[in-house]
Amino acid sequence: MVRTFFTSVILLASYCIQAQELSVIQLNAPDKTRGSAVMKALDDRQSVREFSSETIKPQDLSDLLWAANGINRPDGKRTAPSCRNFQDVEMYVVLPEGAYLYDAREHALKPVVAGDYRSAVASGQEFAKTAPLSIVLVADMTKYGNMSESSKLMAAIDVGIVCQNINVACAGLGLATVPRGTMDQATLRTALKLADNRLLLINNPVGYPKN
């Protein structure tokens, strides 16, 4: 019992130290005037599995995250609708140096864990590991107050809406992506410090098209 307690303390301290190695990334203000028209973006949308090794430009990352689930009104409502405005979808950005949680109110990336977890997102599908970043979508079931099947269904719908925003925004911004359900759930759940009331549902590797 004592040994288990001290092991937990050591692990927690290790996670805190890892997160402290990273800094908050304050994103640029989103450029809401750029990108192609909605109909053109929908026409261009496609699933892409080959990515350039080029790092995502800061403005592209900022605009993509805002389009996916950013705040677009003074009352704090989002670009993606959600069940009863629960705003239950969390976006984790997995970069080579570490994983971050997107804070929509601050329009910033908050450090979660240092280290490259793109392999855990790829989970054996090598093409996904070649993307310079992946966005992992998680449903926060505490917003529903229960883990019923109907609540999980609504949460999955909310995640799907954010995922579609990512797909369309990538098409409009000249980025490449593909929505995926495959990922190493156990590794990511530990790395991202997700409680049992968080559902890991979808991920989107993102990069520039290889060609």
Language-model segments: what does each one mean?
Residues 2-4, 16, 75-77, 175-176:
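Short secondary-structure capping/junction motifs at helix and strand boundaries
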Residues 194-211:
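A glycine-rich helix N-cap at a beta->alpha junction
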Residues 20-131:
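N-terminal amphipathic, basic helical "cap/leader" segment at the start of enzyme domains
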Residues 95-97, 140, 206:
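Short, flexible beta-strand-to-coil junctions
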Residues 45, 64, 91, 133-144, ...:
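Small-aliphatic-rich amphipathic alpha-helix that forms the alpha element of a beta-alpha
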Residues 31, 137-141, 208:
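Short, small-residue-rich loop/turn micro-motifs
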Residues 1-21:
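Bacterial Sec-dependent N-terminal signal peptides
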Residues 174, 193-194:
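Glycine-centered helix-boundary capping/hinge motifs
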